[in-house]
Amino acid sequence: MSQPTDEADKSTGNAQVTHESINFANFNQDSTCVSVGYQSGYKIFNVEPFTKCLSLADTSIGIVEMLFSSSLVAIVGLGELPDSSPRKLKVFNTKRRSIICELTFPTSILAVKMNRERMVVLLEDTIYIYDINTMRILHTIETPSNPEGLIALSSSTENNILAYPSPPKLPNRQETSTKGTTNDNDRSHLENIPENVNANSSNLRNGDVIIFNSHTLQPISVIEAHKAQLSAIALSSDGTLLATASNKGTIVRVFDVETGVKLYQFRRGTYPTKIYCLSFSQDNRFVCASSATETVHIFRLGQDEANNTMPSRWSKNQKLALQRYKQSMKQXQGSKPSSLVDSDSDPDVDELVENDNSDDDELEEDIDDELAEERFNSSLTVPRRVSSTTSLGSYGSQESIGDKIEPHVDSARRSVARMIRRTSQSLGRKAAEKMGPYLHPKFSSLLEPNRHFASLKVPASKDTKTVVAIGNSVGQGELLQLGEHEDVDNSSSTSDSTFHQKLLHVMVVSSEGFFYNFGLDTERGGDCTLLSQYSLLTDVNDG
């Protein structure tokens, strides 16, 4: 799910300079529309084709959320007057241009999420759940401080799942990691921390996620996602998968919501960064992550990636080998395997020469995090993802299909830095093959982790906030445009029709005020190609 963006910088790139700025941007539940809040109103855009379908002048808007493509919109202001207070939520009918209801809360509203059955309003320390058909309040949940406004609601009413951060807790407490329960007011989980323990202690786990059934209004489980504090969470549209990232920004994990089992783990990069947004494709074949590096990474949820993540039992000899190897890493400073010092987060050369003294501690924390959850995962029957003929290569090994399919490389992104990283990853794979039999499988996966299937570079300033979504297949008209920007492999006999079926929209909205539309090759992966871009900073009163 996407997150609200802060006020944009005054720099607008190639766009026409205006006095307008963006307070908020998000995709709707099926990624067919974008809602944008400005200093003087809000707009709603259709993404395919990209057109403005609604523009309303108003006060400064901090949140504008859609209910799919219906006329119902939830609006929260950013003004100082009572009518535009950030504590007031207005549910608006855009077709009738009328307010359905107004709700006032004790503190500022940080997020609003909706599906066809529920509306969820998040304050810093409270969650309110409403029946969206009657706007009657059904339930309240008291939570620990959540200033980042992290919350996710599935768009499906079949699996009406709500996810939000759990309070910190001691990692050595003997609790079932995915069977946490709470009482009606959901306060019992706040007792995880003894009174004499400082909540800011480095010994506490801050990255757990509570799974809540919004239909039955009952908590389901607590998923131990990360040791560090959460930075982003997202639920798949059908409510079956949960994606998480911590404030380190190096690891993205995907869990089965029903069982709490970790299905996938991906390494975004080695250097810490801020992950702004996680988002699943509608068919759960991909999950994408946008970050402060201006790079969006797309990870494939296939069988090969699952096999490289699944826990397995290991012998005492492997345990001892792991301990010896960890000790040798502490003693030999600066002698890390090549694959542990590369970074896929940004193709810029300066990232390769950045100080990386913190890598050892982060790697050790990743290992400890993996070993801590082994006690639970090894006792579960892990569900296997079933191969699908509609996956276009997502499930199963590429080599098993025939010759290995090389990823698409954008000539505009070729650089010495990227060549060094590719060489480093190749050396890492060879090291993993030789050392794998002697290491715990979790540590072996750190030597040769799942990495991104595809990526794209957003033409934006560093630390520009972005939200991202994966849409439908690219149309034939856009393929003609795509052909103007890239050279098609002469050895490929793929027809335009087949090529069309292989490409998906990857859409990015930046806080600088741009909408970017990229093409993702679902079979080859690699670099996504920029198809089009549009400015969102035209006069908000022009519609």
From Swiss-Prot:
Assembly information from the UniProt record: Component of the PI(3,5)P2 regulatory complex.
GO cellular component: endosome membrane; phagophore assembly site membrane; vacuolar membrane
Topology in membrane: Peripheral membrane protein
InterPro entries according to UniProt: PROPPIN, WD40/YVTN_repeat-like_dom_sf, WD40_repeat_dom_sf, WD40_rpt
Family as reported in the entry's similarity comment: Belongs to the WD repeat PROPPIN family.
Signal peptide (residue range): none
Localization per Swiss-Prot or TrEMBL: Preautophagosomal structure membrane; Vacuole membrane; Endosome membrane
WD repeat ranges per the UniProt record: 225-265, 270-309
The keyword Disulfide bond belongs to this UniProt entry's keyword annotation: no
Composition bias type Acidic residues, residue spans: 343-372
Swiss-Prot/TrEMBL keywords: Autophagy, Endosome, Membrane, Protein transport, Repeat, Transport, Vacuole, WD repeat
Pfam families in the cross-refs: PROPPIN
Protein name, per record: Autophagy-related protein 18
